[in-house]
Amino acid sequence: MSSLLGIGGGGNVGVAGGGDFYSYSIDQSLRLDGSTAYLSKSDFAASTDTTKRTFSTWVKRGNPEGVGAYNHIIGAGSSAIDGFGFANGTAKLQWLQGGVVTKDGVRDLRDTSAWYHIFTTWNATDNEVYIYVNGELDYSSTNSIDALSKLGNTGHTTYIGKRSNSGVYIHGYLAETVFLDGTIGDVNDFGELVNGIWVPKNISAASLTYGTNGFYLDYADSSDLGKDVSGQGNHFTSNNLAAHDGVPDSPANNWCTLNFNDSRTSLGWQEGGLRWFSASYSYKAFSTMVIPEISDSDTYYAEYHMAADGYSGGIAPLSNSGSNSNTDLTGFLAYAYNGNFYNNLTATASGYDPVVGDIISIKAGNGQIEFFLNGTSVGTPYTGLTGSYKFGAWALGATGNGMYWNFGQDSTFAGSKTGSS
C-alpha cells in the first residue's frame, strides 16, 4: 500500500524522493500525549558552565493552540524558572530566564503535518542568544543576559516535554534531542539543506562537546525512552510513558496523523494527533495527508479503535475542510458505530454493527472505499470515485473515550488495543 502525501507545507513525505535524499535517517521519535507524559532528571552534577548552553531538537506538533502558558520543551526550576519552548498563547518560540520572558522568536510553528528543527544557543558570557528554525535564523540578540543557572544544573530537576513548575505539557513528537553544557554549538552540525529542504545530519559524526551535564536522547530504545546516548550517562526518567510511545514517525519518515488545524474544536486531542474525542454532534477531524487521486491503482489504508459509541470514520474530499469542517458533510463517506454506511447524511445498513472495543479499517483506492470490522470486510459501499480525498473522523453525538487512529505507525493504538494490521 502507498504512503500518503502531505497536504500542507513542511511535511517530508512525498517530497524527499527516496532514501538517497537523506545522508542520515532518524528512525524513531518520542510521542508525548499533551496531558501527563514527560521526561525528567533530578540528579545532575554541577554544570560545566551555566553561561553557555546549546539546545537542539526536532519537533512535530500535535496541538499548537490548546496549550497553557509557557509550553516548554525543556525547562528547570520550581520558581523563577529557566525554560525554552512555545510562548504564552502563541506558536512562537521563547526563552525564559529566571522566570522572566526574555527572548521571543518570530515564526509561528503551527503546521501539525511538519517536522521542525529547533536549534538555540544561550551565551551569557558574550550576551548572545540565537534561535534557528529549520536552519534559518528566527531570532538573535546581543542585549545583556544572565546565566541559565537552573537548566541542566545540580539542585534542580530538568524536564523535557513539560513546564517545570506547572502541569503544562508538550503535545506531539520529539526526535534527536541534544543539550550541550558549557558549549556554544553550530546549527550546521545538526542539519543541512538538500534541494532546499532542511534535513537531519548524523550528530555522532559532529564531535560535539557535551560538557558534564550534556545529553543526546535518540529515543531508539523503547524500553528506556530517556536513555542518554552521548556517553555522558545523563539518563532521564520516563514519566507516564510506555514502549508504544517510541514511534517510527520522524523527520525522515513523516507519518500521517489527524490534523488539529483541520478539525472542529473537540473535548480532547491527544497521543500526537492519533486520539480524538469530540464535544458534540457533527464535529469532525481530518488527516494531515491526502490521497492524491483515489481512482489510481494505489491503495491507502488507515484504521481506528472505537473506544466509545457515537463515532465513525472514512474519507472526505478536500473541500470538506477548514472552517466548514463542523457543518459540511458533502462527499463524506463513512462507516458508523451504528452499523450504517454514510454518504453525507444518507445512511445504508451494512448488516454489521460494531461495538466499543472493535477495530474499524478503511481501504481506499482504485476508485472505491472498503471497510473492515476486526479484519473482516463488511463491504465496498462506494465505487466510481475520482479526485483527491483525505481520511476523516466524524462524531455523531457521543463523547466518551473517543477513537484512536493508526496510519501505520502504532498498531497498539497508544496501548489501548492490539491492531489488526
Indicate residue ranges for each PLM-predicted region.
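Extended recognition patches within non-cytosolic domains
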Residues: 2-28, 35, 136, 142, ...
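Extracellular glycan-interaction surfaces
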Residues: 7-34, 56-65, 80-150, 342, ...
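Short surface loop/edge beta-strand patches of beta-sandwich-type extracellular domains
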Residues: 33-53, 102-110, 163-166, 200-208, ...
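Extracellular glycan-interaction patches encoded by glycine-rich segments
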Residues: 101, 151-174, 396-398
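Glycine-aromatic-enriched beta-strand/loop faces of beta-sandwich-type recognition domains
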Residues: 312-359
